[in-house]
Amino acid sequence: MRKIGIIGGTFDPPHNGHLLIANEVYHALGLEEVWFLPNQVPPHKQGRNITSVKSRLNMLQIAIEEEAYFSICLEELDREGPSYTYDTMVQLTEKYPDVQFHFIIGGDMVEYLPKWYNIEKLLKLVTFVGVARPGYTLHTPYDIVKVEIPEFAVSSSLLRERYMTKKTCKYLLPEKVQVYIERNGLYES
């Protein structure tokens, strides 16, 4: 069976923390690939102003282009409405029956797992991989794989805030993504 990691998110914008997490889990678990799964409308972010799918997808393609074992999974972008991980993983496990999926989540989402839609059924479809994030523990009633990674405290919301207040984002996200953001006037106040 093939082992593939999935890291879901809004990627608004994608940053070096996303890449670090994907790379560390890839090596720690001996995965064949890591798929980045951009979501249409994450249930926990409904009502928030999110950058267009086209721009988020372009930035993500730019961010991962140098790693052969990184790719983008468009499953959630092909659907309208809220993106529930359970629905996506039902589709992916039917489409790829020879794959053992490892769903990578940060410490913030580990604590939130009991509230995930159809969590009991989802646990039968994927192995959750929890990575530590500053300010969060990896405590959950569920069986998850824990992977320690170097601490890198950056988030997409921090980057959006820094762009809006005209602070530098150098070394926090890939340089080519930074160029794309600036050329397209994203995150300006």
Curated annotation (Swiss-Prot):
* Major enzyme class: transferase
Could you tell me what this protein is called?
Answer: Probable nicotinate-nucleotide adenylyltransferase
CDD domains from the entry? NMNAT (cd02165)
What organism is this sequence from?
Answer: Bacillus mycoides (strain KBAB4)
Any one GO BP annotation for this protein: NAD biosynthetic process
Asked if the Swiss-Prot or TrEMBL record annotates the protein with the keyword NAD, the reply is yes
Which InterPro entries does the annotation name?
Answer: Cyt_trans-like, NadD/NMNAT, Rossmann-like_a/b/a_fold
Q: Which family does it belong to?
A: Belongs to the NadD family.
User: Matching Gene3D superfamilies, A to Z?
Assistant: HUPs (3.40.50.620)
Superkingdom of source: Bacteria
Q: Which Pfam families match?
A: CTP_transf_like
- Pathway(s) this gene product operates in, as recorded in its UniProt entry: Cofactor biosynthesis; NAD(+) biosynthesis; deamido-NAD(+) from nicotinate D-ribonucleotide: step 1/1
Q: Which UniProt keywords apply?
A: ATP-binding, NAD, Nucleotide-binding, Nucleotidyltransferase, Pyridine nucleotide biosynthesis, Transferase
One MF term in the entry's GO annotations = nicotinate-nucleotide adenylyltransferase activity
What EC number(s) does this enzyme carry?
2.7.7.18
